[in-house]
Each structure stands twice: as structure tokens, then as C-alpha cells.
A protein has these predicted regions:
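Thiamine diphosphate
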Residues: 1-48, 57-74, 78-104, 111, ...
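Short beta->alpha connector loops at strand-helix junctions that form conserved
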Residues: 112-113, 137-138, 196-199, 309-311
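Conserved G/P- and acidic residue-centered "switch" motifs that form tight phosphate/ATP-binding loops
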Residues: 130
């Protein structure tokens, strides 16, 4: 009984004092949430909790809309539009925003348990039968199924759609759950489309766009965060494969943003304008792969400095941009890449994690000021 502390201490003490000539196997059985009914009765909740009502077990979560909830709501619309849409989770229906989908479309929802490798290959099987599978999974857990992603999906060029939650920093969940590497390990794969929205609206539009990708795998990465302003009733806007979006026109310096650091980029741009009297260009690249090469070619005409911003380790979006410039441009330009530091960052407030990794507006300005001077 793993809940009998006194017995466990006695056992450990016994074997500690005993002269052993080999390994000892202890089969210790525990039950999630034992002694607290709301936790015992909930298969997929209470693994990690915020403050909650002790009597009911209801967690006091923020009412602000999250990227995860945008995914859940948009998938319902896509499922209504296309009966081939299916969803897959590895024991995380509520954590990935699929709980409402599970209730409304039980025959098109699949929880495979804590078996990420099976989830990926299972989705590949669905894709071969002309279904449109969406695999909703945390970035850190997708790492467990990388072999299946490569061999069962990418090499076969199967149109599985990966919804990669918890990409980037995750605050209190710490280094074990940080989605630090997905851009790096997906952008190097042939036959893959990789997207990262800068807002809730962009995420909704990317989800709708992904429905039309029927010849290769795709991935949308998004953070554990709230979306800010969001109009749920707004119609879908068209997204074109591999095309970025000009947010602000300027000269000399071009910010190439990928993902939800766009507001930090805007703040850094304001600092440059106020302190150096220079209006910079800001691009929401949208795609880590394929990148908007035509846009980059056009920007070279009146920009000398290119700044990439991403919430990922080295080797991701920035590498795609660097490779393009190294192989395609004859003009002498400067490139500075902002990405996660080459270290594991422990539990902390997410704003502090940005500062530790050098992706705060102030640090961005500090680094860029070298070029301005």
C-alpha cells in the first residue's frame, strides 16, 4: 500500500540494514487522489492544480480565453463542416481542449491513454483511410513519439495535423514540461509544414487552413497562455501556405517574428523609434517551414539588419532564415537571432523566464542598439 507511510518506512529501513546480494523489487501501489473524492473520480484532472474549492473540487481558473480553448472551439466548427475530422489525445482530453469535442462527437474522438507513440501511428492509419486526424498533444510529450513522427508520418507524407500545446515556456511547470524543441526537431523533417500563430485569431485561421492540407503532415504550435482580444464570431480569414504578414512597414531593421512574441517585438520597436528615431519593419512570419522566401527577398531591398524572434531552442525558425540568407543573398546584411538560451530554465513566473532567456523587449532593444550605434 503506497499510501501507508509507516509501512513504507519500515520496508525501506529493513532493506537498507539488510546485507543484499542483488536488486530488490518493491511493488508499491498508489491511487491518484486517494482520500479526496473529486480527484479520485476524475481520470484526467488533478495531476497539477491551481487553487480550488475544497468542497466541490472546482479549480479557480482564469476566465480569460486561452490558446487551448480556441483550439477546442475551432475544432468543433471544423468537425461540423467536415465529417472526416477526427481528434486524438494521449490521456489529456481536457488538458488539450478536446473535452467538448469528446462529448459532442464521441465516435470521432479517441483517447489512446498515455501512449503518445501509438497516438501518432494511429493517426497515420486514419490518414491513409481519407480521414482528417488532429493529434492534440503537449510539445514535451510529442518528443516521446519522434520516431513515429519521422517513420510513420513524415516519410509516408501522411496528412496528420499536429496541434502542439504548451510550446515555449510554461511557467510553473518548469523544464520537464517546457516546449523548447519542437521547431528544431520538426523543421528538419522533409514533407512537414510548421506554423506558429501570433494571436488567437491567427490560431483559428491556421486551424481552418490545416483542413485543406491533404498531401503532407502539418503542425501548429501554441503556448500555455491567454489570447487577449479575441472575436469568436469573426469569420475565418484566408491563410496562404508559406506566406507571412506585414504588421508594420519601416526601413533598415526588419523584425521576423514567429509565434506569440509579437507584442514583445512591437514594444522593442517602439523603444527603437522613441530612442533612435527609426521606424522598423515588423513581420509576422506565421510559417517556420516553409518560410516566406519572396518576402525576405523583397525586404533585402531596403533593410540591412534582420532580427528573428522565436520561443524555441537553437536550430528552429532562425536556422531556416539563416540558411536562406546564406544561400540566396549576395547583399551584405546582419542577422541577429533571439531564441531560448542553451540551458534548462526551472519553474518561475513566465515573464521572468522571458527575461532569463533574453526575449524581453528591453533585452531585445539592448542587443539591437549595438547595430544602431
Amino acid at each position: 500500500d503506497g499510501h501507508n507511510l509507516n509501512l513504507l518506512i519500515q520496508l525501506f529501513q529493513k532493506y537498507k540494514e539488510k546485507e543484499l546480494h542483488g536488486p530488490v523489487f518493491l511493488h508499491i501501489i498508489t491511487e491518484k487522489g486517494k482520500g479526496y473524492a473529486p480527484a479520485e473520480n476524475s481520470n484526467d484532472k488533478f495531476h497539477g492544480v491551481s487553487s480550488f474549492d475544497i468542497q466541490t473540487g472546482v479549480q479557480n481558473k482564469s476566465k480569460d480565453k486561452t490558446y487551448t480553448s480556441v483550439v477546442g472551439e475551432t475544432l468543433l466548427k471544423l468537425a461540423k463542416k467536415d465529417k472526416r475530422v477526427t481528434t486524438i489525445t494521449a490521456a489529456m482530453p481536457s488538458g488539450t481542449g478536446l473535452d467538448k469535442f469528446q462529448k459532442l462527437y464521441p465516435d470521432r474522438f479517441f483517447d489512446v491513454g498515455i501512449a503518445e507513440q501509438h497516438a501518432v501511428t494511429f493517426a497515420g492509419g486514419m490518414a491513409t483511410e481519407n480521414l482528417k486526424p488532429y493529434v492534440a498533444i503537449y510539445s514535451t510529450f510529442l518528443q516521446r513519439a519522434y520516431d513515429q513522427v519521422v517513420h510513420d508520418i513524415a516519410i509516408q507524407s501522411l496528412p496528420v495535423r499536429f496541434l502542439i500545446d504548451r510550446s515555449g515556456f510554461v511557467g510553473a511547470d518548469g523544464a520537464t514540461h517546457a516546449g523548447s524543441f519542437d521547431l528544431t526537431y520538426l523543421c528538419c523533417l522533409p514533407n512537414f509544414i510548421v506554423m506558429a500563430p501570433s494571436s488567437g485569431e491567427e490560431l483559428k485561421n491556421m486551424l481552418n487552413f490545416s483542413l485543406s492540407i491533404n498531401n503532407k503532415p502539418s503542425a501548429i504550435r501554441y503556448p500555455r497562455d491567454t489570447v487577449g482580444e479575441y472575436n469568436e464570431k469573426k469569420s475565418f480569414e484566408k491563410i496562404t501556405l508559406g506566406k507571412g504578414k506585414i504588421i508594420q512597414k519601416g526601413k533598415k531593421i526588419a523584425f521576423l517574428n514567429l509565434g506569440t512574441r509579437l507584442n514583445q517585438v512591437k514594444e522593442a520597436s517602439k523603444l527603437i523609434k522613441s530612442k533612435n528615431k527609426l521606424q522598423t519593419t515588423i513581420i509576422d512570419m506565421r510559417f517556420a517551414k516553409p518560410i516566406d522566401t519572396q518576402l525576405l527577398k523583397n525586404l533585402q531591398k531596403n533593410h540591412d539588419i534582420f532580427i528573428t524572434i522565436e520561443e524555441n531552442a537553437v536550430g528552429g525558425f532562425s536556422s531556416q532564415v539563416n540558411n536562406f540568407f546564406l544561400n540566396q543573398t549576395k547583399k551584405q546584411i546582419k542577422i541577429h537571432n533571439f531564441f531560448m538560451k542553451d540551458e534548462f530554465i526551472d519553474q518561475s513566473d513566465i515573464i521572468d523566464q522571458y527575461k532569463q532567456s533574453g526575449i524581453s523587449p528591453e533585452n531585445i532593444y539592448k542587443k539591437i542598439s549595438v547595430y544602431l550605434n
